[in-house]
Design a protein with these regions (language model features):
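Glycine-rich acetyl-CoA-binding "A-motif" of GNAT/NAT acetyltransferases
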Residues: 34-35, 165-168, 224
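Conserved acetyl-CoA-binding loop-helix of GNAT-fold acetyltransferases
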Residues: 55-62, 192-206, 227, 231
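Flexible, substrate/cofactor-facing loop regions flanked by secondary structure
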Residues: 106-179
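Conserved hydrophobic beta-strand within the GNAT/NAT acetyltransferase core sheet
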Residues: 184, 214-218
Length: 247
């Protein structure tokens, strides 16, 4: 289905990771030489590529999705596909649009170490010694990688340790085609202390050192993420549709 990728869809979070095998998923196509494809991760992230006017395939795709219980997250879903789904099945969509960012390296500068005042907080790379703790800290880790071995082989990330406890963590949610998706999490009681900023500066610099382009993407109402993106040199590129789908 590589020929169905284009500028409009190739940026969707984790799509390339599924196609590259870093994330478990399934692909449904309309014919031997596909004009349309449905891509679904095992954690129910959904992407539709290609021809949206083939209603018989859209029906097949919706039936395919209905086989599993629970909500799905559909990235890039169009009004055409929504209307088609409504005409075939009783389905509910809840919209959660996201912002896609573009990294401007010239706007990225590392702050002075003195900006971060917590001397007890220490950054450590994620490795075989702490990977289990890192995965326990972030349940979403399993959505991004097919196990710790795959992450240690293909991904990278950092944890912020304070009093021998992880308080914040940044990882490559995916590494595909020279680009890295950033995923940052901080425990609620430690937010507002600059831990996420400090980790992300380290992470972005590591991306650049590796010759990789960092990617940022967040929901439109996530103001802390938007503010952090700006500080790191990311610029808003576009808003695109995402919806939670429930049968």
């Amino acid at each position: 289905v590589e020929h169905l990728l284009n500028e409009a869809n190739i940026h969707y979070p984790l799509l390339l990771s599924i196609l590259d095998g870093d994330v478990a998923g399934r692909v449904l196509v309309d014919q031997e030489m596909p004009t349309a494809a449905l891509v679904v991760s095992d954690y129910r992230w959904v992407y539709y590529l290609g021809n949206e006017s083939n209603l018989s395939f859209v029906t097949e795709a919706v039936d395919f999705l209905k086989e599993d219980d629970g909500p799905l997250i559909w990235f890039g879903i169009s009004q055409v596909l929504k209307q088609a789904c409504h005409s075939f099945r009783a389905v509910v969509f809840l919209d959660y649009p996201r912002i896609r960012y573009l990294f401007n390296e010239s706007a990225f500068t590392l702050p002075e170490p003195s900006v971060f005042m917590d001397a007890e907080a220490q950054i450590s790379p994620i490795n075989c010694a702490n990977i289990d703790a890192a995965m326990e800290f972030s349940p979403s880790f399993h959505q991004f990688w097919n196990g710790p071995e795959r992450f240690l082989e293909r991904g990278f990330g950092f944890v912020m340790m304070r009093q021998r406890m992880i308080v914040s963590q940044v990882i490559a949610a995916s590494v595909a085609r020279g680009e890295v998706e950033v995923n940052i999490e901080t425990i609620e009681s430690c937010r507002g202390n600059g831990y996420a900023s400090r980790l992300c500066y380290t992470f972005v610099q590591t991306c650049l050192d590796k010759g990789l382009l960092p990617k940022w993407d967040c929901m439109t109402e996530n103001e802390p993420s938007k503010a952090l993106a700006r500080r790191l040199g990311f610029e808003e590129l576009e808003t695109y549709p995402v919806a939670v789908m429930q049968f």
